[in-house]
A protein has these predicted regions:
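Periplasmic-binding protein-like
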Residues: 168-176, 243-284, 304-320
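Bacterial lipoprotein signal-peptidase II cleavage site
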Residues: 23-32
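Extracytoplasmic small-molecule ligand-binding "clamshell" domains
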Residues: 33-147
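Extended ligand-binding regions for polar small-molecule ligands
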Residues: 39-67, 199, 267-305
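Short loop->beta-strand "edge-of-pocket" segments that line small-molecule binding or catalytic clefts
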Residues: 83-86, 104, 185-199
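Acidic, polar ligand-binding/catalytic clefts
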Residues: 112, 116, 124-187
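A ligand-binding cleft/hinge motif common to bilobed small-molecule-binding domains
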Residues: 134, 150-159, 228-262
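C-terminal motif of bacterial Sec signal peptides marking the signal peptidase cleavage site
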Residues: 18-22
Length: 320
């Protein structure tokens, strides 16, 4: 028998049914959580063995924010807006403000900075709300210009898309109900653990906790609903995401253990648009220089994750 469903579960589920958009444009929505959890199977993916996953394309010369005729950035400017794939239900990173209706967060601030660099106006963007599993697809199909959705830079993803330099280093942890007998990664055997489908969190769970029973959902909010309904025993994901979930549910807690992975976030760009990657890296360098990265971290993440260790140093040298 399922444990009692807390009232918050119904609130969260109801919010998920609302259509979401941004900047006056609404072309998609956040899927509702699954009616039944999807149990995943298959062999755990092998640990990644490449040593250059953080290496990106260096910004261009003396004017990294130049927009040459015929460039990807020029095409975006002619269109009149930047199109970005984002989350709209990941509190602190990309979520709808219930008062203003705007989708906002740490990841959204990067979209604004890219739009500002192209148009001189940080509001010239359209947000396409996507699930974690759709991040590669929308880039491969050129449905968006960038994806800013807490996406870990991995060797496998480099095979189908391109990444900016690392803009944040997260780490994977575990969230449980208060009073749970789960104390860490080594106590997950026999427990149902939720992670969004198509994420490195799910891959890491399969590899590092083979005795756990993995359960997939469209997003972490869907996992939270399953936890509240008693259909899963724990959620695993990046510390940034879990901090956002715990801040919304007084019965949830992130286990006080060291992160068991490193999850470097990058801005995703279509693989054939190297000029756009260089441009985005120029934007990131500008955020380092003018303090806007630190300001964004202080606003969104510092209250929950503590003082920043600083914007990650970029690694360049990748060639097309």
């Amino acid at each position: 028998m399922n444990r009692p469903v807390h009232r918050l579960a119904g609130v969260v589920a109801g919010l998920l049914l609302l259509g979401l958009g941004a900047c006056g444009v609404d072309d998609t929505f956040v899927p509702s959580p699954p009616s039944a959890p999807e149990v995943t199977g298959g062999a755990a993916p092998a640990a990644q063995d490449c040593n250059d996953r953080l290496q990106s394309y260096a910004p261009n010369g003396s004017d990294p924010l130049a927009i040459p005729s015929g460039s990807t950035m020029s095409t975006i400017r002619q269109r009149g807006r930047l199109i970005a794939g984002v989350s709209a239900d990941t509190f602190l990173l990309g979520a709808r403000n219930p008062v203003t209706g705007a989708v906002e967060g740490f990841d959204i601030d990067f979209v604004k900075q890219i739009a500002k660099a192209i148009f001189g106006d940080e509001t010239r963007y359209q947000l396409r709300v996507i699930t974690a599993a759709q991040r590669l697809e929308v880039l491969q199909n050129h449905e968006v210009d960038v994806v800013a959705r807490n996406m870990t830079i991995t060797c496998d993803r480099w095979k189908s898309i391109a990444f900016s330099a690392e803009y944040y280093l997260a780490g994977q942890k575990i969230l449980v109900r208060k009073g749970s007998d789960i104390t860490g990664l080594d106590s997950l055997d026999g427990h149902r653990v939720c992670a969004p489908l198509g994420t490195s969190s799910m891959d890491n769970l399969l590899r590092l906790a083979p005795g756990a029973e993995p359960v997939g959902a469209d997003n972490h909010t869907g996992c939270l609903v399953l936890l509240q309904e008693g259909q899963v025993d724990a959620i695993t994901g990046d510390d940034t995401v879990l901090a956002g979930l715990a801040s919304q549910d007084p019965y949830a807690v992130v286990l006080d253990e060291a992160a068991f992975t490193e999850e470097p976030y990058g801005i995703g760009v279509p693989a054939d648009q190297v000029d756009m990657v260089r441009f985005v890296n120029g934007v990131l360098e500008g955020m380092r220089a003018d303090g806007s990265w630190e300001a964004s971290y202080a606003r969104w993440l510092q209250p929950f994750l503590g003082t920043s260790s600083g914007q990650p140093q970029p690694q360049y040298g990748r060639t097309p």
